[in-house]
């Protein structure tokens, strides 16, 4: 079964929201209600002495002796009566520091005991504390969407009048500022996921999800429809038969008619490719600190990336120019031989390539039409090493006539020890300076320029086979984290990879295979190919995936 869960959320509202409620148990914390995007709050199925709440089937847990250490969300002090209503309605207030827009509010109650509020009033207020919208709702399930497009609200008051079952506490787990739209087998027409990795680190691929579905909710020209509230980084969770196939983010929707919409989505690596990293000169920089610097600049939370400790503890030197955050991570990946990937999750994972074989793709999983290619022999690999040193004399990094204002000036080469005339430097780095001009006129920024001295480092075959021609691969000279300290190691690693000359491309019935993993594949003449899966093009409906595996030939294992 295909499930594509689309979070139509105001992606900034959760972090900007502060909740308060007077009618709440002392062990409950309403601040956890505002979970971001498609993240879910994990709450244990506690037993209570409420009417008919404790099922004697082993599904409930004995209530904690230290409930303050557990997660509850909003658990009210008041209990509903025999008529399911509270003696006094319970109010939850959500305050924001800036205006937001939403297509509605999704309320998530206790699914394990199928209980929820029986009536809710939502009131929206603007920045002047004026009521701009209100509506009553009557939930009929533990997850309920309060549908209403509201723009520029800065406070929401939710009033709960009772519970769906008598003599119950109100138990609200999450408040989502938007809608959760689920596309499944009944509505999805087609759905493809592309997963790619480059074991050399020469390219940092963007995984994609593209699907077409029957829906009338996304009329692109309807100013009152759901699309009117869409924002960047809307999350879409992809699952096949309950297994997580990743979290993607809306890139661009398009419609050919009134009933279908095609959603083109990218992974987190694609998201950070839309923003710039200002770079810098690095001398004996801890890679963990460098990656943290890149991620912080990209507004990626620590929980949204994973860096293997074997990489984090390494030291690196060199230079990163102004580039996208994705390109900055690619520089790190190439210099360290790391794989950077988001496959089957949301977080950006940075980890070393592995030679552990995960399993075998047997003939009965392969579709007809596989092509095996024996690539041209690589007899050598050359990389360009960079050494950065400050020039002994100052030079101009920038000179121009500017009017009054604040400017970000970028340089064509890295500089240090910057000074300015005609302006004040507010902040700066090796590649840029933010300046303020108070009086219009000539502005000059001077400093000591870093000079890049390059050399070529190569690894070559000791002997060529008979009739073989030299075939030396020259790697990108713009890999500026390659220095005399690591150039030999990088060239050796690349040379060894290029000795894997077999490529197998074709369709398979997808099982547990993932891009970036090492697998064996039954091939020709009772032999196997063993290597890295570099490419998986997954049809989510049929379970068939186009695969590309690069490796070497091995004897068939019995």
Regions found by a protein language model. Name each.
Residues 1-68, 180-189, 194, 198-205, ...:
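Surface-exposed cap/loop segments at beta↔alpha junctions
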Residues 65-133, 140-185:
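Aromatic, loop-rich ligand-recognition surfaces of beta-strand-rich domains
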Residues 132, 172, 243-245, 397:
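Local beta-strand/beta-hairpin segments that build beta-sheet-rich folds
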Residues 19-20, 26-32, 156, 188-191, ...:
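Generic structural motif
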Residues 135-137, 248:
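Short hydrophobic alpha-helix segments
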Residues 167-168, 242-249, 526-535:
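Short, Lys/Arg- and Gly-enriched loop/turn segments at beta-strand edges
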Residues 85-90, 96-101, 107-130, 139, ...:
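An acidic/polar, Gly/Ser/Thr-rich interaction patch typically located in mid-to-C-terminal regions
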